[in-house]
């Protein structure tokens, strides 16, 4: 009887390992596609590929995150895209990712993406949307920082918001510079786990240089 139980346990372990390897391999391949994407169509295709992984795994948060991140990149590149509809899709992916995310640091990463979705909507008409999408974008950063104050992407995005806000409204280079400085410093010690987001460092360095 013990032999049968042991055999079942071994087969179960092998099955879980094979499933895990399949997931990791699929994610690695699709992240490579994401990194090499150059056009809106490329990012749309990559997003669809991550959705397929998410549908197969169901309990993982990273495929949903990357599906949304790819749509965010598409939205910034394609000026003809319906930003409200696109951001709505991103927020939906964020909801699914957050439902699966376990740790506060994982959830903080999702609020990075939520901020970008709200910002994309605000930029359709900044003057009329600042009180809605703009405030929501700021709230997303605050929530992310409350979950993980060491995530450098949060400070990079805060710096971007201040950099692009006119001085008379509380923004400008001088206000943005400390945020970029903090992002650059945090990136130096930020540990990137396998398959996890690994973007923003070079952008933060470049933006800090613009503030000098």
Regions found by a protein language model. Give the residues of each.
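Bacterial Sec-dependent N-terminal signal peptides
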Residues: 1-26
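Structural marker of alpha-solenoid helical repeat scaffolds
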Residues: 56, 100-104, 147, 186
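Outer-membrane beta-barrel transmembrane domain signature
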Residues: 129-154, 160-171
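Canonical positions in the second alpha-helix
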Residues: 53, 97-100, 143-144, 183
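Terminal, low-structured helical/coil segments at or just beyond the last alpha-helical repeat
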Residues: 174-178, 182-212
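Hydrophobic, well-structured mid-protein blocks that either form specific transmembrane helices
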Residues: 87-140
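Helix-turn-helix repeat elements of alpha-solenoid scaffolds
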Residues: 35-49, 83-96, 130-138, 177-181
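Amphipathic alpha-helical repeat scaffolds of TPR domains
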Residues: 20-33, 56-78, 104-125, 151-165, ...
């Amino acid at each position: 009887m013990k032999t049968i139980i042991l055999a079942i346990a071994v087969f179960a372990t092998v099955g879980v390992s094979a499933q895990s390897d399949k997931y990791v391999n699929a994610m690695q391949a699709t992240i490579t596609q994401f990194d090499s994407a150059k056009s809106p169509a490329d990012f749309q295709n990559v997003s669809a590929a991550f959705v397929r992984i998410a549908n197969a795994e169901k309990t993982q948060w990273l495929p949903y995150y990357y599906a949304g991140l790819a749509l965010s990149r598409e939205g910034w590149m394609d000026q003809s895209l319906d930003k409200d509809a696109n951001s709505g899709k991103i927020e939906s992916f964020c909801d699914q990712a957050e439902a699966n995310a376990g740790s506060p640091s994982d959830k903080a990463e999702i609020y990075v993406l939520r901020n970008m979705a709200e910002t994309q909507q605000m930029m359709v008409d900044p003057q009329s949307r600042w009180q809605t999408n703009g405030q929501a974008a700021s709230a997303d950063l605050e929530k992310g920082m409350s979950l993980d104050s060491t995530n450098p992407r949060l400070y990079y995005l805060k710096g971007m918001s201040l950099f692009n806000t006119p001085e008379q409204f509380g923004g400008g280079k001088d206000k943005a510079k400390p945020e970029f400085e903090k992002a650059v410093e945090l990136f130096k010690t930020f540990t990137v786990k396998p398959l996890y987001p690994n973007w923003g460092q070079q952008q933060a360095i470049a933006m800090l240089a613009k503030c000098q």
